[in-house]
């Protein structure tokens, strides 16, 4: 079951977007130096269409994007909820996923406007470091384009 612990409006995770970042628990990656180790636990409330709709109704006039922060243990469910947002909000909200997996999930294509891939490796840093192993992709023209360099300006 996909669960979320909290959420916040953020400005740096996705370029040029005001993003509702929803933190998902049950992370399987256990990255050394993780900034949110509590998200490795199976905690929080179920994130389903009803819970997501309630969140979006509260913030839809304040945000341009929703980002699922994690959820790799339930990747198909994250992709399904992204599709639900696209259909229900008819493209008015962009969708993003911060995944710790090294590769794009096969179901991500067409469901997300942005996807971050790669586990956090403390020695390499996050997306804002030129040494990072992580990548940020934007879906454009039917495929994902690497825009990681935009995060390093």
What is the meaning of each model-derived region?
Residues 1-23, 28, 36-41:
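N-terminal [4Fe-4S]-dependent radical SAM core
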Residues 18, 111, 132:
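Residues that flank catalytic or metal-binding motifs in active/ligand-binding sites
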Residues 22, 31, 115:
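Conserved, mostly hydrophobic/aromatic
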Residues 36-48, 58-76, 91-104, 114-139:
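Core AdoMet radical
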Residues 48-52, 80-83:
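Charged helix-capping and loop-helix junction motifs
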Residues 79-91:
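Surface-exposed amphipathic alpha-helices with a cationic face
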Residues 139-153:
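Charged phosphate-binding loop/patch that engages nucleotide di/tri-phosphates or the phosphate backbone
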